[in-house]
Design a protein with these regions (language model features):
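Extracellular beta-strand-rich solenoid/capping regions of secreted or surface-exposed proteins
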Residues: 40-45, 60-75, 81-117, 121-143, ...
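Acidic Gly/Asp/Thr-rich repetitive segments characteristic of extracellular carbohydrate-active
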Residues: 22-56, 67
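Acidic, glycine- and Ser/Thr-rich low-complexity intrinsically disordered tracts
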Residues: 334, 339-340, 344-349, 363, ...
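Short glycine/acidic-rich loop motifs that flank beta-strands on beta-rich extracellular proteins
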Residues: 63-65, 84-87, 103-104, 124-130, ...
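A structural signal for beta-strand register positions
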Residues: 78, 119, 150, 174, ...
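Detector for repetitive beta-architecture
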Residues: 19, 50-52, 57-59, 65, ...
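Boundary at the C-terminal end of the N-terminal hydrophobic targeting segment
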Residues: 13-17
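Bacterial N-terminal signal peptides
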Residues: 1-11
Length: 420
């Protein structure tokens, strides 16, 4: 028994079939020695038959990029994301990729590879002089996983594609991302993003050189948290960002655009929560969303641009805060809101007199919604092809501006109540 106590964690990990320890390959985990080569050697050793490379507790300085081979998992000790103070567990101190946004990522993942259970911190990044860095994770190929990860101050978080890829799994990733959180492109078979939260307070602790105010300001001015180019049937569940420039952005790339389902998503202290520039015709299914805008001149939680050619459907979503409006659509396609709560309330006062919902193109449905503040509820502007507005109520009834005449079906709404 006494001898067992002398066996190092690294030796135990080495002895376990299919498991390799970076300590046995020469990693120091002392935050001073460059451990890039030792970690990569362990990953390459595991590649022959597949296996798990263990990162015991410690601070591993990585000055370069790490390639995770097919069939290999880089495994830290953390079973869940962690807070930044005290900074414990398996911690990667990354210094490579500074000034090279398109350079190699800290972790390059291919087929059937994974990174789990660790924290990433960029110790040379400064809150008062934020500098671009390469992506922390870059995924391509089939069936790769990033799970139970804490990002202290990543400039760019997780990039999937643009190379061909399918069935990515991004789970339980928490932390601070400064410019971009997760970017998906080139995915042709259902990717999954689950239980993700981005927030400035992960880089507010003195232990990691953080300060709330400059990080908070940089994020709401610059951060795009979730960006979707080409992805087929993307499943996104339980995600959140605070603060942010654009929470969820849908774009056209060389590979195409997105469709998918988005449930339990949220964005707070945003300029725009959801911005739809391009999607596939079958479009977006958004449910149980919570959207608050506070910063900038736009302050529209859901903005659908005239370049959008696909369907946007929102069900059981809530809009509040000092929004200028809640939903504005210029789309030539379909936009639908059902069972939503919409308001511009902040501190008990409504902040604008613009319509809560406004559309000037395509076709619109607003059904079973409640309007929590007393500006116009829905504006059907010239250029809108058709609208159905039914079974809505509000603090002053459903106030509807109709500029399209009999192209609108308006029925069974609470009558408008004139101010007293």
């Amino acid at each position: 028994m006494a001898l067992c106590g002398l066996i190092s964690l690294g030796t135990l990990a080495w002895a376990e079939p299919g498991s390799f320890s970076v300590l046995m390959a020469g990693a120091k985990a002392d935050s001073v020695s460059d451990d890039t080569a030792a970690i990569q050697k362990s990953l390459d050793d595991a590649a022959a038959s597949g296996g798990r490379v263990q990162l015991p507790p410690g601070r591993y300085l990585v000055k370069g990029s790490l390639r995770i081979p097919p069939g290999v998992t880089l495994q830290g000790v953390m079973e869940s994301p962690v807070w930044s103070e005290p900074l414990k567990g398996s911690v990667i101190l990354a210094t490579g990729g500074r000034g090279q946004e398109d350079g190699p990522a800290l972790f390059e993942l291919g087929h059937s590879s994974a990174v789990r259970g660790l924290t990433v911190w960029y110790p040379e990044q400064q809150t008062t002089n934020i500098f671009p860095y390469a992506w922390t994770f870059h995924l391509q190929g089939h069936d790769n996983t990033v799970e139970n990860i804490t990002l202290i101050n990543s400039y760019n978080g997780v990039r999937i594609g643009p190379e061909s890829n399918v069935r990515h799994r991004i789970r339980s990733v928490y932390g601070c991302v400064l410019r971009r959180g997760i970017l998906v492109d080139g995915c042709s078979d259902i990717g999954r993003i689950e239980n993700v939260q981005f927030h400035c307070h992960w880089w507010s602790a003195p232990e990691v050189g953080g300060t709330w105010k400059p990080v908070h300001e940089f994020m709401w001015k610059n951060c795009e948290a979730f960006i979707f180019g080409r992805t087929d049937w993307e499943y996104v569940n339980n995600t959140f960002v605070f603060p942010v420039n654009i929470g969820y952005r849908f774009i056209q790339t060389k590979a195409g655009a997105a469709n998918g389902q988005f449930s339990g998503i949220g964005a707070d202290e945003a300029q725009v929560c959801v911005k739809v520039e391009a999607i596939q015709p079958m479009g977006l299914l958004i449910s149980n969303g919570q959207f608050v805008c506070m910063h900038g001149d736009t302050r529209i939680p859901v903005l659908v641009e005239n370049t959008c050619q696909g369907s946007v459907r929102l069900v059981n979503c809530s809009f509040w805060g000092p929004n200028r409006q809640c939903v504005v659509s210029h789309s030539k396609s379909f936009v639908s809101l059902s069972d939503c709560y919409l308001s511009t309330t902040f501190g008990g006062k409504n902040t604008t007199r613009l319509p809560l919902v406004e559309a000037d193109a395509g076709k619109l449905q607003v059904r079973g919604c409640s309007f929590g503040t007393d500006e116009p509820s829905v504006a059907l502007r010239k250029g809108l092809q058709h609208a159905i507005v039914t079974e809505n109520n509000g603090v002053r009834g459903a106030q509807i501006i109709n500029e399209i005449g009999d192209q609108a079906v308006i029925a069974n709404n609470e009558p408008e109540q004139k101010p007293r």
